[in-house]
Amino acid sequence: MAKLISSPSRVKAEGKLEKIIEEFIGAVNTGTQNVSIALMTSPAGWEEPGQTPEFDEYSVVIRGTLRAEGRDSVTEAGPGQAIFAARGEWVRYSTPGAEGAQYIAVCLPAFTPVTAHRDE
């Protein structure tokens, strides 16, 4: 049976500027542990600490540019493109463009602050 998720939960974001995280499916909004799906809206110049997560992360860009820095590479995606970051690999996300970015992030299993293993 299909179930309507009528609204997301706002989740506190890390980073120097405020990013809006609206989790539709995941540990916070639905108690789901195996996947999280969130709409992310970040301003120009936003960046978060690096992390070595226990989850795979798929990010589909709707607007702006999303950057993912790895140990040996930098990947940027624009509207209609996606970035995949594998679990166990260090990554740091940012939105370097003047318009910031809006994107959908899907994490398998679900994102939690504990399993993100953010840099200190």
At which residue positions do the language-model features occur?
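A short, N-terminal "cap"/entry segment at the start of jelly-roll beta-barrel domains
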Residues: 1-34, 41, 49, 115-120
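Short, charged/polar surface micro-motifs in flexible loops or helix N-caps
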Residues: 30-33, 43-46, 63-66, 109-113
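Short glycine/proline-enriched turns and hinge-like loops at secondary-structure junctions
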Residues: 33-35, 52-53, 96-97
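Short, conserved beta-strand element in jelly-roll/cupin
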Residues: 39-43, 53-70, 106
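A short hydrophobic beta-strand segment most commonly corresponding to one strand
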Residues: 40, 84, 99-115
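Short beta-strand His + acidic residue motifs that chelate non-heme Fe in jelly-roll/DSBH
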Residues: 48-50, 68-69, 85, 91-98
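Short acidic-glycine-tyrosine-enriched beta hairpin
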Residues: 72-87
